[in-house]
Structure formats: structure tokens, C-alpha cells
């Protein structure tokens, strides 16, 4: 929980407010699928009716968070857990398709190879360090790693936004795997080093984002006369 809180706070410091909102709905959708009460296990339609709107709200808040819900849906689909896959996957796809039809958009966000290194590395760490019985986590990390490579190779609107999933939840998966690793073995030490690296990565990236996204005081001061002149001539009226 603390590892997740650290990732979410770092995301807020970086200024990704709408993505944070979308992540809240995304977590709700995923929790609905995986934490559905056992006594209602046969009520699959009820589960879908709860998970799908949350997945849709996640995508409406932030298409990037909707994309990450889709990655979990793919992992479930590959395990032949089709009801959960459809519940999580169809709503984000419908929201994106409707948005593209109503509000056509174009352009791409560049993503250099350097931006892929750490997300790929931590996708590999999660795949390697979590227990082999955690199939959904391992498949999701593998699908995510492949997605990072595809986004780097193929220019799209996603770009470096794909890195956010590992920045939020790689630490959570690694911390969760720690109690299942034999202490003071090579794997345990490697896992601890990976966790320390994750904390350093997220801490540095958040501080860097905060520094570079804060408007300079001189910019605000020098812009004030121009804004005042525009207001006096009624520029806001067109």
C-alpha cells in the first residue's frame, strides 16, 4: 500500500492530475474483477455491470489510464478468463472509438529509446521476481514490455505516456514479491537493489518534473502587461 501511495504521490507531484483521476477509476474497475465477493461468484453480469462503467470513466478521465486497464484485459484474455477481459476491455475501446469519431485528432508524441530503458527493465524485473503462480501479474508485465517496444517503434499519440504504468505499480509488485522470496539469497538481494533503484528513479523523475513545470517568476511578471493590454481591448471577445 505504501509503495502504491508513493507512486501515486509522485504522479501528483509531476502534475498528472487527470491521469491520477483516471487511475482511481481504473483501480476500482480492476478491484471489481479481482475482489468480487465469493458469495456472488455466479453473478458475472453484475460484476461486468460494475466494472465496465468504472473502466469507461477511467478512459474518459485519461485515455492513458484506460490503456492500462486494457493491458490487464489482454492478460485476462490470454488466460481464457473471458468475462473479466470483456468487462475491462470493451468499455475503454468504445470510449476511445467514440472520442475519435466525435473529435478527430492527429499528431504523435515522440519517444526516444532512452525513455524505454527503465520501463522495459522494470517490466522484466516484475516478470522475473514475482512468484510463478502470479500469472496475471507476469502476463501483464510481459504485455506491457512488448507495448513499450511497439510504442517506441511505431509513432503514435501514446508516446512516452506508456512509461507511467511501471512508474506507478512496478514498485508495488516488487514489494509484494519480497515476502515470497527466500531472505539473503541472490534473488532477494537483487530484488532489494531493484526496489532501491525504483525509489531513486521515481524520486528523481518527480523532482525533475516539478522543477521544469513550475512557471518562472520572471515569465509571469513580464507577461502581465501584455495580458492587461489584451483585456483592455476586449481580446477575449474575439
Residue ranges of predicted features:
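Hydrophobic alpha-helical membrane-interfacial segments at the cytosolic entry of transmembrane helices
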Residues: 54, 80-100, 193-197
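Membrane-embedded helix bundles of polyisoprenyl
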Residues: 1-37, 47-77, 97
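Short hydrophobic alpha-helices at membrane interfaces in multi-pass membrane enzymes
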Residues: 2-5, 35-56, 82-91, 138-144
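Membrane-interface helix-loop-helix junctions at transmembrane boundaries of multi-pass membrane enzymes
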Residues: 82-88, 126-142, 178-189
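Transmembrane alpha-helices and membrane-interface helical segments
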Residues: 28-35, 72-80, 124-128, 167-185
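Alpha-helical transmembrane segments at the extracellular/periplasmic loop-to-helix junctions
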Residues: 93-97, 103, 107-173
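Signature aromatic-anchored transmembrane alpha helix within multi-pass, membrane-resident enzymes
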Residues: 182-203
